[in-house]
Amino acid sequence: TLALGYDYWWNTRNTKTYTFSPSNTNKEPKIIIDRNYQDRYNDPGSFVKRRNFYGKSILAVNKNNLFLMGDGFRDDGQFPFIDKVDLNSLKKVRLYESSFKDKKEDLLDFEVGNNMILTRIESASEYPNYFFRDLKTDSLTKITDFENPFLSIMDVSKEVIEYKRSDGIDLSATLYLPKGYDINKKQKLPMIMWAYPREFKDNKSASQITQNKNEFTFPYWGSPIYWLTRGYVVLDDVSFPIIGEGDNQPNDNFRKQLVDNA
């Protein structure tokens, strides 16, 4: 039998993933992943699961292979992926990696035996729809046909901007401009900034970009996006890292870093 175990260490932001055999307690657990869980660029993803006869969620194992499904954040964008992992050698083979640069693709489930992915595809103005992606034929089959119900904000300007904090830390945010705004006129408008501070133990993880300009602009309850219809600029999902490297704790300099972020 095969099972996975996880541990987390808050002080270092380290996490480890182990394989072990519940039916053989004499066999030592094996570390298969050892990483900083705040490092999104090197996130290997989550192990694919399936339902057993009893409707319970279990690992999807095929010929001594496990499968990882990841978000695929990189410094040049977001490209979700599926990897096959050999349990003996821990070598990985990439089965699929999204290539969209003008859309956002989310991998929702993977049917291992049939090489079929349930995926969702969207853009900033195209409402998310669901597809089956067949890896054997490299084909997409659309299974929903939802239309954009938020036409009043469909043509707003949206981009992910990058800038530096006073201490050199790279920051990012999603900038929305009202429909019809002429950037060449440099007209000043009121702005709403939507941010929440997050703790990090290293500068590298704090600087990673996890916004996607192709994510559908969805005005959920409580969202600041509604203010675009009233002529406001919206700066959303703003990076607000509070960093404490080494023996320093993030909140030791909370106020100073909070001001620097703003």
Stretches found by the model and what they are:
Residues 108-262:
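Serine-hydrolase catalytic core recognition
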Residues 1-139, 145-156, 170, 207-208:
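Beta-propeller folds
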